[in-house]
């Protein structure tokens, strides 16, 4: 079978002449020349297009990295702000608790002072009431004694003796008042 193919190929070559006289050969040569001549400019254009695409992709990647860094910085800033806010809130709470304790102590102290003052006022009122009661008892005793003395003197002394005693008492009165 191979021998038949060789024989057919040789017969074909003898019938048509040399290979460079065939139009297929020259079409092939022209195609190769066109491809060879167009290769350099086309490869440059393809390389330029690929370089441009690569540069565009690189710029997008750089922008993405920059955006990522900015996002990380913003995240860190917000986390720091959140920590600071939490710390400030804790400080405010601690201050409020301390202030509440201080106010409670102050209120207890003020209540104690007020209670002592009221107790003192009550004691003063009691002392005044006692003094008033003593004065009233003394006045009542004096009135009773005067009444008894008048009764006794009136029964035992005469009118002349009573007048003499009153006159002597009036004379002694300025010396006893000063």
Curated annotation (Swiss-Prot):
PANTHER family assigned to the protein according to its UniProt record, in alphabetical order: ATP SYNTHASE SUBUNIT B, ATP SYNTHASE SUBUNIT B', CHLOROPLASTIC
HAMAP family cross-referenced by the UniProt entry: ATP_synth_b_bprime
Keyword set, alphabetical order: ATP synthesis, Cell inner membrane, Cell membrane, CF(0), Hydrogen ion transport, Ion transport, Membrane, Transmembrane, Transmembrane helix, Transport
CDD domains assigned: ATP-synt_Fo_b
GO cellular component terms, A-Z: plasma membrane; proton-transporting ATP synthase complex
Principal cellular location given in the protein's record: membrane
A Pfam family this chain is assigned to: ATP-synt_B
Role noted for this protein: F(1)F(0) ATP synthase produces ATP from ADP in the presence of a proton or sodium gradient. F-type ATPases consist of two structural domains, F(1) containing the extramembraneous catalytic core and F(0) containing the membrane proton channel, linked together by a central stalk and a peripheral stalk. During catalysis, ATP synthesis in the catalytic domain of F(1) is coupled via a rotary mechanism of the central stalk subunits to proton translocation.
Transmembrane segments: 29-50
Name this polypeptide is given: ATP synthase subunit b
Family, similarity comment: Belongs to the ATPase B chain family.
Organism: Paramagnetospirillum magneticum (strain ATCC 700264 / AMB-1)
Compartments reported by the entry: Cell inner membrane
Bilayer topology annotation: Single-pass membrane protein
Molecular function terms from GO: proton-transporting ATP synthase activity, rotational mechanism; proton-transporting ATPase activity, rotational mechanism
InterPro entries: ATP_synth_b/b'su_bac/chlpt (IPR002146), ATP_synthase_B_chain (IPR050059)
Source species, domain of life: Bacteria
Disulfide bonds, paired cysteine numbers: none
Quaternary state and interactors: F-type ATPases have 2 components, F(1) - the catalytic core - and F(0) - the membrane proton channel. F(1) has five subunits: alpha(3), beta(3), gamma(1), delta(1), epsilon(1). F(0) has three main subunits: a(1), b(2) and c(10-14). The alpha and beta chains form an alternating ring which encloses part of the gamma chain. F(1) is attached to F(0) by a central stalk formed by the gamma and epsilon chains, while a peripheral stalk is formed by the delta and b chains.
């Amino acid at each position: 079978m191979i021998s038949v193919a060789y024989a057919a190929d040789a017969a074909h070559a003898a019938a048509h002449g040399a290979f460079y006289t065939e139009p297929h050969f020259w079409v092939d040569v022209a195609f190769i020349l066109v491809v060879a001549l167009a290769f350099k400019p086309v490869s440059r254009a393809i390389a330029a297009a690929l370089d441009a695409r690569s540069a565009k992709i690189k710029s997008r990647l750089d922008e993405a990295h920059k955006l990522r860094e900015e996002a990380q910085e913003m995240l860190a800033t917000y986390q720091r702000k959140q920590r600071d806010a939490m710390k400030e809130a804790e400080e405010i709470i601690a201050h409020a608790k301390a202030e509440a304790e201080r106010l409670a102590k102050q209120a207890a102290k003020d209540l104690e002072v007020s209670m002592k003052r009221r107790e003192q006022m009550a004691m003063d009122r009691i002392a005044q009431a006692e003094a008033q009661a003593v004065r009233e008892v003394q006045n009542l005793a004096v009135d009773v004694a005067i009444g008894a003395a008048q009764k006794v003197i009136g029964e035992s002394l005469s009118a002349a003796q009573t007048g003499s005693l009153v006159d002597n008492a009036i004379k002694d009165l300025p010396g006893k008042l000063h």
